[in-house]
């Protein structure tokens, strides 16, 4: 402890419980991870399919300023997406809502099926407004540097039926 000071205690707090209990998963957790891995391919197909359809819908919406999704032909990342992932760009997209932060707040608050959470990769659709959640501690210059604008909404598109996802996004956009 003399050489490391308080860091020695922190290290002990991390190492001793692992030494005593091991870093082994419980049988139930191991089973659930295995189940998730076995269906990952199927779920990713649905995530990508739904995200591409939602991105196409958003491109046509009058209250949407821009859409960022690599599988769209007008994306600057389209060629890379096509070459690397066979045009499957994942289940995450972002878009800009006309009306700025106030419209984004109304959009997020109006979602009914899509959950308002900042994590990604769930089977359920999730949405967030990064400027007021994950990046809220940044100043304006840092937000710009991070590519986060006041009008940006990020959606992790789930595996629900695409008609349900679009209906929820549509009714929320109508309230902006």
Please give the residue ranges for each predicted region.
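PLP-dependent enzyme catalytic core of the Aspartate aminotransferase-like
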Residues: 43, 109-110, 124-176
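Active-site C-terminal subdomain of aminotransferase-like
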Residues: 1-92, 96-124
């Amino acid at each position: 402890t003399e050489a490391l000071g308080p860091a020695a205690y922190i290290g002990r707090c991390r190492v001793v419980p692992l030494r005593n209990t091991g870093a082994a998963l419980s049988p139930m957790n191991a089973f659930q991870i295995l189940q998730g891995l076995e269906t990952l391919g199927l779920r990713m197909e649905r995530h990508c399919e739904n995200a591409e359809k939602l991105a196409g819908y958003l491109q046509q919406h009058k209250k949407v300023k821009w859409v960022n999704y690599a599988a769209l032909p007008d994306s600057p990342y389209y060629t890379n997406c096509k070459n690397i992932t066979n045009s499957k760009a994942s289940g995450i997209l972002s878009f800009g809502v006309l009306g700025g932060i106030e419209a984004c707040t109304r959009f997020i608050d109006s979602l009914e099926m899509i959950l308002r959470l900042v994590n990604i990769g769930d089977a359920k659709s999730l949405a967030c407004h990064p400027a007021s959640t994950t990046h809220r501690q940044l100043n304006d210059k840092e937000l710009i540097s991070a590519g986060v604008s006041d009008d940006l909404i990020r959606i992790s598109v789930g595996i629900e039926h695409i008609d349900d996802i679009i209906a929820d996004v549509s009714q929320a956009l109508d309230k902006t």
